[in-house]
From Swiss-Prot:
Residues 544-585 are annotated as: Disordered. InterPro entries: MFS_dom (IPR020846), MFS_sugar_transport-like (IPR005828), MFS_trans_sf (IPR036259). This is Organic cation transporter 1. Residues 62-155, 206-212, 265-269, 382-389, 438-446, 498-504 are extracellular. The chain crosses the membrane at residues 41-61, 156-176, 185-205, 213-233, 244-264, 270-290, 361-381, 390-410, 417-437, 447-467, 477-497, 505-525.
Amino acid sequence: MSFQAMETFAEISQEILMSATKPPDFDFVLEQVGNYGTYQIVFFFIICLPTSLPSAFSAFNIPFVVGNPPHTCHIPEGKEYLRPLTNDTQILSCKQYNETQINVFRAFTSAPVDTYSDRISLVPCQNGWDYDNSTYLDSLVTEFNLVCDQQAWIEISTTSFYVGSFIGNCLFGYVADKFGRRRSFFVILTVLIVCGTASSFAKDIESFIILRFFTGLAFPALFQIPFIICMEFMGNSGRIFSGLMTSLFFGAAMALLGVVAMFIRRWRQLTFFCNAPFAFYIIYYFFLPESPRWSVSVGKWADAKKQLKKIAKMNGKSNVDVDELVDSMKNHQNAAEEKETKRSHNVTDLFKTPNLRRKTLIVTYIWVMNAIIYNGLTLNVSNLPVDDYWSFIINGAVELPGYFVVWPLLQCAGRRWTLAATMIVCGIGCVSAMFMPDGYPWLVASASFIGKFGVGSGFAVIYIFAGELYPTVVRAIGMGMSSMVAGSGLLLAPHIVNLGKIVKILPLLIMGLMALSAGILTFFLPETLGAPLPMTIEDAENFGKKPEPDSGMFTQAAKKRESQPLLEPHTPMDRRRRSSRLMNI
């Protein structure tokens, strides 16, 4: 036997040894049945994508529902003298002259009120308010008179939604990982439809706030769970596609909501329209499958086989022996993996090991910054010299081009560099507003839109990136926890925007610095392009521990793609290839 033959024999022997110890993981099995074929595309467009509509419509109709139009004290006919003689809209909105004092003066003089108005005290509106209905035909504010000393109810109604989101993120993240994605989705959908629709019939502000809380409880998970299912059905390129298309559709849904609200200018009808029609999605119960990746992670092998066979059949790969592949994966589960899949998981698992803890904290910080900036810029857009409806439409539409920009970047530059770039662009755009010359408000608006362009793109990337960093056994918990903390951060957004009353440019400056800090911190996360999704806590802890010697943007991404083996050492085809090579020796 020649030296070359001996070398080849040694190489093959090593491959055979590897095949005995290295089982096929789920990503390999999914690749065999098709990880981005007809099944995934049909599933995504018919089932996953449409579920972005109810989450966008239910959550973001609130600016129109609580629209606060210009208003003044209602002055009875013939008593115009009760209206304060000032151009201060804040006074005119909530104050009128004290009628008792005026009557005393009028008993002794016939002089006009303006001659002694400085001696008349101002009192709260005594006869209700007159509202300008040129923008809103009615709203929660105008129906329940939530103005002046009652204005705090508007903030409470908004806050109740975010408090519900905060709790729902944690609760339904656990439920989705414990009981499955499919069951959780329909529980959440039912809660949102019932409570959202019921809020359109609220008889008082207290009832509306309670129902709004439960709507918020369901909102985050309703958006996240279909995305998680899609991501767990697909390979690397499919995950990019599904993540960006979901965000693209969400942005389009936001713009569409602005158009719908423009035609439905009564808050009860709008609230009903934004919730009740989505009861149609209940029929998805008969079509939405459980994630086979989740089934594998909790040891439901029969369910995983059944779903993988459907995928293989629809993708034209019926010749693949799914039973053999899944049985091999099952039989080669090591003791640690078996322990992982059988025990119950909770949010503390994300913090027990140092590497996963570090990644969790960084991802959560970036998510919080993204959420505050995204919502802050949305609120700040209302200050542009266009009406509320056009502001909202522009706010949704400006995100759309960003998704087309990050799509190729995610595949050639990777997740880390793309996320960092989007947040830094956002930061530069917002901070640049302070350098704009006075008298050119459109320049400040452009800076704000550049910021929204960046943070909107980053919103799509963080979902993909976080989903690939968290392991399957706690993926929904991890994403729910990060989103939950971000939801609590959302309470800061209105206060940051209100700082514009002190210095107009201050909100953009603060949000710009937030974005820059998030962009820089992104570089401390490992790249996930081309890497298999971690299944267990151990997988996630080991991933990214050792930085690659060459961390260049395009070089690293290319190496990850090239490093993917064409044939795994445990496949039947590879065994035949080895036999052929041995015969040639």
